[in-house]
C-alpha cells in the first residue's frame, strides 16, 4: 500500500446496513482517540504499545467495513514486528492517519 494524494471519501462497506449504522458511527467517533494513542506511543518509542494498538485497529477496521484502514494498520503492526526503524514506522502511521481522515459515516 502506498501513500497517495487520494482524497476520495471512504465509507464503510456496511454503511447501508441499518443494523450497523450506530456502531459504525461510534467507531468513527472513537477513531481520533485511537490515532492519538498511536502517536503518543510512537513519540515515546513504545513500539509494543504501538504494535498492540495497530493490531487492535486492524481487526476493528475490517469488522466495521474499512478494509483500507485495516490494511494500513496491518502495515504498522508488521513494521514493528520485523523491527523496522522509526522512520518507516512513522511513515506508516502517517499513511494510516491520511486514510482515517478520509473516513465519513
Show which residues each predicted segment covers.
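Two-component system phosphorelay core
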Residues: 1-105
Amino acid at each position: 500500500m502506498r501513500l497517495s494524494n487520494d482524497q476520495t471519501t471512504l465509507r464503510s462497506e456496511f454503511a447501508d446496513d441499518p443494523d450497523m449504522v450506530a456502531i459504525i458511527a461510534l467507531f468513527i467517533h472513537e477513531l481520533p482517540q485511537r490515532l492519538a494513542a498511536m502517536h503518543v506511543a510512537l513519540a515515546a518509542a513504545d513500539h509494543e504499545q504501538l504494535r498492540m494498538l495497530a493490531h487492535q485497529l486492524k481487526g476493528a477496521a475490517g469488522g466495521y467495513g474499512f478494509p483500507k484502514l485495516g490494511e494500513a494498520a496491518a502495515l504498522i503492526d508488521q513494521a514493528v514486528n520485523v523491527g523496522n526503524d522509526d522512520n518507516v514506522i512513522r511513515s506508516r502511521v502517517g499513511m494510516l492517519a491520511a486514510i482515517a481522515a478520509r473516513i465519513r459515516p
